[in-house]
Regions:
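Glycine-centered loop/turn motif at secondary-structure junctions
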Residues: 10-12, 67, 124
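A generic, well-ordered mixed alpha/beta core segment in the N-terminal half of proteins
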Residues: 42-112
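Midchain, well-structured core segments that form catalytic/ion-binding scaffolds
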Residues: 81-82, 86-225
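Beta-strand segments within the central parallel beta-sheet cores of soluble alpha/beta enzyme folds
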Residues: 19, 33, 69-80, 217-224
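General small-molecule cofactor/ligand-binding pocket signal
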Residues: 15, 77, 128
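A general structural motif
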Residues: 29-31, 71, 139-141
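Acidic/His- and Gly-rich active-site-bordering loop/insert found
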Residues: 1-45, 63
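Buried hydrophobic packing segments
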Residues: 3, 53-63, 199-202, 206
Length: 225
């Protein structure tokens, strides 16, 4: 509600799509998309996401005061699900905008067994409307996002700004390791099928694999066991 109010105060008309993305629209013609996300994670970096949304709103407010001298319009997007904090999905809000939403993610569930589709209903949304979030590529000039640095590279180089030339693609996997319970003091080591030990080996393998491909900018994280 606060972000929507800021958008209106900046001179935009505001709508919300089926995945909770707020869209502030200003000016006629083809669209320049500005924005970022307003969801977060525990202990996120300061201004992670909101910076890009606020920069977009301030940009529109500036040109609105000038009587809109631009030959194109601006849409400010505030994505509601970038982090995938609740469900094991990736970038669902922006993927819908791009027209590549993965509908199988609607069957995934959170830690309480609530599915993505069920959560949308509680939020007053209809999954059947997700396709309506898509932009026609012919109507879009570009997408620009201002974001905080999420790694230490600029800080280590003592540089205030950087231009991003590429970002990592994101995939999430849920792996189930099934073992066999046995007495801790009497089952011989060669006969053990300890699921936790197997999972630990997998965690170390993922770490090693990413480090071996560090030159390719590969990263990998095991976030939950």
């Amino acid at each position: 509600d606060v972000v929507a109010r800021w958008m209106r105060e900046a001179g935009m008309t505001v709508t919300e799509d089926a995945l909770g993305t707020l869209r502030g629209r200003a000016g006629p013609g083809k669209r320049l998309l500005l924005g970022s996300h307003i969801d977060s994670v525990i202990d996120a970096g300061n201004y992670d996401g909101p910076l890009g949304v606020i920069v977009g709103i301030l940009t529109v407010a500036h040109f609105h005061k000038l009587g809109w001298p631009l030959p194109f319009g601006i849409d400010v997007l505030a994505f509601g699900d970038e982090e995938g904090s609740r469900f094991p999905s990736t970038l669902s809000s922006s993927s819908a905008v791009a027209g590549i939403f993965q509908y199988d993610s609607l069957t995934t569930s959170d830690n309480h067994g609530v599915t993505f589709a069920e959560a949308l209903k509680v939020f007053g949304k209809n999954a059947a409307d997700i396709d309506k979030a898509r932009y026609n590529p012919d109507d879009v000039l570009a997408y620009v996002e201002t974001h905080i640095e999420q790694g230490p590279a600029l800080e280590a180089a003592n540089e205030p700004l950087g231009v991003v030339v590429g970002i990592v693609g994101q995939s999430r996997l849920r792996i189930v390791v099934t073992g066999e319970a046995g007495h801790a003091g009497t089952v011989p080591m060669p006969m053990r099928r300890d699921a936790l030990a197997g999972a630990a080996e997998m965690v170390l393998f993922v770490e090693t694999l990413a480090r071996d491909h560090a030159r390719d900018a590969m990263v990998a994280t095991v976030g939950r066991i």
